[in-house]
Amino acid sequence: ILEFRPALAAWEIKWPGAAVVEKGGDAITSGFAERLAEFDAMNLDHYRRSLAALGALRRDFARFEDFADGFITLCSPTMPPLYPETGDSVFGDVSSCLGAPAWSLPLLEDRGLPMGVQLMGNPHRDYELGCIGRWMMGQMREG
């Protein structure tokens, strides 16, 4: 579903990254420097195909707008990590690509650690999604 995302990110960081390298490059990690070399190989046609794929995904998602006010997913594909790790934010990639608001609600728990539920809404419906999230948090406190 998100195969175009790395290409979009690569294209959008290509020139700022090159500017950092030009100034000396010591401000970036070796891993990022390697990625910049990969980004250099990308061309405008690849970027445009990636944008078209993103547009198609957003159009498909828009068909659900009258069907659902929100969607519930987990915030992370695994249980909460122990400090100092922060976990995997892969579910946030979906809402970012869709241009959809998302709220992480600490509704679950594992090993005494909060485990978030992600409430994702329709684009430009941030306020409505916030109201739903507030209601969900209230229900959990009462229950």
Predicted stretch roles:
Residues 1, 79-80, 110:
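Positions that flank functional sites
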Residues 48, 52, 97-143:
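Structural helix-boundary/capping segments
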Residues 5, 49, 76-94:
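Short, surface-exposed loop/helix-turn segments at secondary-structure junctions
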Residues 4-58, 106-116:
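Short helix-loop capping/hinge segments that flank enzyme active sites or metal/cofactor-binding pockets
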Residues 59-64:
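Short amphipathic alpha-helices and their capping/turn segments at secondary-structure boundaries
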Residues 69:
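Conserved acidic residues
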